[in-house]
Amino acid sequence: MAKTAAALHILVKEEKLALDLLEQIKNGADFGKLAKKHSICPSGKRGGDLGEFRQGQMVPAFDKVVFSCPVLEPTGPLHTQFGYHIIKVLYRN
């Protein structure tokens, strides 16, 4: 059976902005509010919520991080062809 996970993410074009957002989140800023304000991904409108997805559904670099990083700990920035991601895994099965 395939592994599944649920995650939030913020996607931006600039690494500097991603680093700044990660620092804000680690200092207590609301992930969802920052996603709504800054994310260029359509999921930003939902606070960065990607919902539940199966391992292998996302681009390989994103998939690798989601299925290996600590749950509920903001991680990043991760660079993909889409830009820079800040990721927060909500759960993994």
Curated annotation (Swiss-Prot):
Give Gene Ontology CC terms. cytoplasm
Question: A Pfam family this protein belongs to?
Answer: Rotamase_3
The catalytic activity of this protein is classed by the Enzyme Commission as: 5.2.1.8
List cystine links: none
Q: Does the keyword Isomerase apply?
A: yes
The protein's annotated catalytic reaction(s) are: [protein]-peptidylproline (omega=180) = [protein]-peptidylproline (omega=0)
Q: InterPro entries, alphabetically?
A: PPIase_dom_sf, PPIase_PpiC, PPIase_PpiC_CS, PpiC/parvulin_rotamase
Protein name listed in UniProt? Peptidyl-prolyl cis-trans isomerase C
Q: Which organism is it from?
A: Escherichia coli (strain K12)
